[in-house]
Amino acid sequence: MTVTISSDALDFLLISAESSPDREICGLVLGEGDHIARLVPCSNVAAEPWHRFEIDPAALIAAHRAARSGGPAVIGHYHSHPTGLAEPSPRDAADAVPDGSIWLIAGGNRVTAWRAVAAGRRHGRFDPLDLACVDGMAAPQGEDSSRDFA
C-alpha cells in the first residue's frame, strides 16, 4: 500500500528531525485514507523526550475537535529517532495501538511510513507502507512550525 505526502511536508519533517538531535520531535498526520494532507507539529510532553515521544494531549484533542467540525481527520502521527533508524523500535511497538493509523518515522536522514496493526510484520505491531511524494498538498502548520511553507 502507498501513502502520499507532499515534498514540502516530507522536507519539513526531515529538517525538523535534524534540528532536534537530542529530543524526539512529534506531531499529528492529518488527511484522508492514505493521503496525507497536513503535518501538525506538537510539543513532546514525554518524561524522557530523548528516547520517547508523547504528543501533547491538548493538541490531539484540538485536532479531533477540528476534524469533527469538518477539518481533516487525524490519520496518524510522526516522530523522530534522533540517534536511531527510521524504523519502529520495540518501544514504539509496545506503545502502539493496532488501530490502522499511519506512523511516519524520521531517522538517519530518512522518513519511513508504517501502519499500526495487530500481528504486524515488524515487532508484531507494524506493517511497512510505501511513501510517495506528490506536490500541491497543504504544507505543515502548527505552533512549533520552524519553516514557512506558504
Where are these regions (language model features)?
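Conserved beta-strand-loop surface patch within small alpha/beta domains used
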Residues: 1-74, 82-150
